[in-house]
Amino acid sequence: EDINYQLAQNDDKTAIFEGWCDFLNYFDASIRFQFSFLNLYGGHDAMEQSILVPLRGDAFDEIRAEYSGMLKTQLAKGNNGLKKTRYITFGIEADSYRVAKQRLERIELDILHNFKQLGVAAAPLSGKDRLRLMHAIFRMGSSEEAFRFDWKLLPATGLSTKNFIAPSSFEFRNGRWFRMGKRFGAVSFLSILAPELNDRMLADFLDIQSSLIVSMHIQSIDQNEAIKAIKRKITDLDRMKIEEQKKAVRSGYDMDIIPSDLATYGGEAKSLLKELQSRNERMFLVTFLIVNTGETKQQLENDAFQAAGIAQKYN
């Protein structure tokens, strides 16, 4: 889907973008959700096994073997074993476990249906799948320690699931970086200063050839509360505009000359209010985080510097 979007004509890109806008507008203020984009080294051998086409002992085995060989060749000269996956995590608050379970199941079905409408293949993760994923995240894809887990082991050993996924150690002595097992890591947040962000920014982050995690924590704001908040902001801006005009009159220059920031922010706020009221758009609070990791501090610094350059380019 990423490749389809990048190669599409502008009209098709607009249609895809609007489809994703509709997808996001499904989430009301009661649902908290997060997109996670993972670039992890999954182990070359495991990836090679996953792409092989099994032989079936018929006349087409020669074609299957040739196709498998072609895939192995592409893998060898492709992404250096970097496995890219995407996840959506969502949660709600409820008065009881039963109510929460029923609603989460309904939301899950709706999300899967909405993904299908977008042409995106998606599948839910089981409890063991989630543990396997967290095990990989804590090691950033390193295959040094295999994931070994069975639910039957919990009552027999007295251990919890944390014992099966936790790395050998955590270290948070430094304010700029941390250690997770043998790897160094750093978390950066994106301050969104531009009025619009280019649709290439996320793709460029994920094109960094190293283990990283990009996450977007998203909270929809209640429609009425969002409209009230924007109206209060417009009122504040109008009040500041009046104060600036009074200063201009007292200083003897044209009262229509006001700071450009006031004019810009006022126009953007009114445009946002119009979209919320007339186009049924939603307002979201977004926290954009990037986790860079490296086997050495120098590698970590290099990757973090590259990510900062991308943020500066588009923001």
Describe each PLM feature range.
Residues E1-N315:
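Extended, folded cores of ATP/NTP-driven motor/assembly subunits in large transport
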